[in-house]
Design a protein with these regions (language model features):
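Short connector loops at helix/strand junctions that flank enzyme active sites
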Residues: 48, 58-60, 72-76, 99, ...
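A glycine-rich beta-strand to alpha-helix segment
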Residues: 174, 182-196
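RNA substrate-binding interface of SAM-dependent RNA methyltransferases
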Residues: 70-170
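N-terminal positively charged helical leader segments and presequences
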Residues: 1-69
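Short secondary-structure boundary segments
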Residues: 43, 108-109, 173-176, 194
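A short acidic, often aromatic-flanked loop/helix-cap motif at beta-alpha or helix-coil junctions
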Residues: 12-13, 150-157, 177-179
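A short acidic-Thr-Gly-centered motif at the start of a beta-strand
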Residues: 162, 180-183
Length: 196
């Protein structure tokens, strides 16, 4: 945890928070924080700054928070990824978020096993936890946009252009020996096909 990610439910006053659970255990057991210890903090989908531990017990930690700086900008990259195996899905999601990708679309295609869509890793709680862990790692409090599309052809024909906006669209293809386009890197939508 490189940044303490705070949610509105943590606040017990205008600039005071109380945390428990995983985030508290990280401060208490791993960092061994004591009153006066400073750490980076960010408010979910809001500003970043710092926090100072004011009280810590085996069950919870209280901190004073000062978050007034704007969050770091996202990379000008959007991803469209064929839905990978469930074990790989959370790794792909985590890696993309830690690299600053702000928009990710997971897509159905012919080689995607239909059973992947019923995996418990695609339910809200594992998604939320993976996203929060990735945001804590990269010190960015802004939740990326993650969408799922079950139909390949309608997405490519009807939504891809609006999803990509004015960005250039690149398709990562394993059979092409040509290097990627040269020149300045601007907004890019990168399409990544299925495993195998």
């Amino acid at each position: 945890m490189n940044m303490l990610l705070l949610v509105p439910e943590d606040f017990i006053g205008p600039d005071r928070v109380r945390i428990s659970g995983r985030r508290h255990r990280q401060l208490h057991d791993v960092i061994r924080a004591e009153p006066g210890k400073r750490c980076r903090a960010g408010i979910l989908n809001g500003p970043v700054g710092g926090a100072v531990v004011t009280a810590i017990s085996p069950e919870e930690t209280e901190l004073t928070v000062e978050c007034m700086l704007p969050p770091p900008p996202k990379q000008p990259i959007a991803l469209v990824v064929a839905l990978p195996r469930p074990k790989t899905f959370l790794k792909v999601l985590h890696a993309a978020v830690t690299m600053g990708v702000g928009r990710i679309c997971f897509l159905e295609c012919w080689k995607v096993d239909k059973s992947y869509w019923s995996s418990p890793v695609l339910t809200p709680e594992p998604l939320r936890e993976t996203l929060r862990l990735a945001l804590e790692q990269c010190c960015d409090p802004v939740m990326p946009e993650v969408i799922f599309r079950r139909r390949f052809k309608p997405f490519v024909e009807d939504e891809l252009r609006s999803y990509a906006g004015t960005s250039r669209i690149l398709l990562a293809h394993p059979g092409v020996d040509a290097p990627p386009p040269a020149g300045p890197v601007g907004e890019t939508t990168l399409l990544i096909g299925p495993e195998g």
